[in-house]
Amino acid sequence: MNFHKSFQLNGKTFANPNEIIDFSKEISSEIHLFLKDWFSEKRILEVKTSGSTGLPKTIAIKKEFFINSAMSTAEFLDLKEGTVALMCLPPKYIAGKMMLVRALVLGWHLDIVSPKSNPLENNDKTYDFSAMVPLQLEHSLLKIDQIKKVIVGGGVVTSQLQEKLQGIQSVVFATYGMTETVTHIALKKLNHFLPSVGFESFASFYQLLPNVKIYKDTRNCLVIDAPKVTEEIIFTNDIVDLVSDRHFEWLGRFDNVINSGGIKLHP
């Protein structure tokens, strides 16, 4: 598995995969092990689910699905080669792993900090992109303008938090997805809305990433057909309203159980 020539990790450039693997030892054992697997001959990687909506389990994901997910995010958010990104999510789960893959595949300059509630503490650098959970976003509001685009998942963004986002320069998106779909398959803008045209603005709903189709089952729950990131049709327990063939509104859980301690809505 190759990597983009523009890829940088914590300010360092690399000539070959072995240099990246060796350097990652200094960062964390979890990242080191993932990168060893990523650059190995394996076509499929095992990833643990967070257990947000059920018992934690391990699932197998093709490397090509990781790459396809990275490309879709970059296309949707217009994140090009040389994007300066901050990784502040744990590498144990898919959201953290995908920050690494996006950087490797797309040629980003990635800084990694330990996952904590205020990842911008003692950091005055400006970034093009980062992914956070709501707790991190809440604790970073005073400095969040250092990041141009932020995706947030792993829990519900409260109306109080969204209200606070209206006065910041950063553009913030809520994510919808899961480990089985290799993080998000849809994003919803949380601020910087354009004036509504017509009855309602699509900006207030989740918008699908490229190569994703959705419909509802008999329970009114979302069904996901995303062949670029999963070979299976995903039947969820998320009750939705289909606003268009590209937009939906999340209404709640069919089983009415949400464990916000895990990462369900992955960035």
Model-predicted regions and their roles:
Residues M1-E26, I67-L86, K116-D128:
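Conserved ATP-dependent adenylate/AMP-binding module captured primarily in the ANL superfamily
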Residues E30-K48, G82:
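Conserved pre-ATP/AMP-binding loop-to-beta segment of ANL
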Residues I44-N68, D78:
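Conserved AMP-binding A3 loop
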Residues K62-N68, V84-H139:
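AMP-binding/adenylate-forming
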Residues V133, G154, G177, D238, ...:
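Active-site glycine-centered loops adjacent to acidic/histidine catalytic or metal-binding residues
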Residues S140, I144-P195:
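Gly/Ser/Thr-rich phosphate-binding loop
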Residues K213-D241, H247:
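AMP-binding/adenylate-forming core of the ANL superfamily
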Residues N237-P267:
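AMP-binding/adenylate-forming catalytic core of the ANL superfamily
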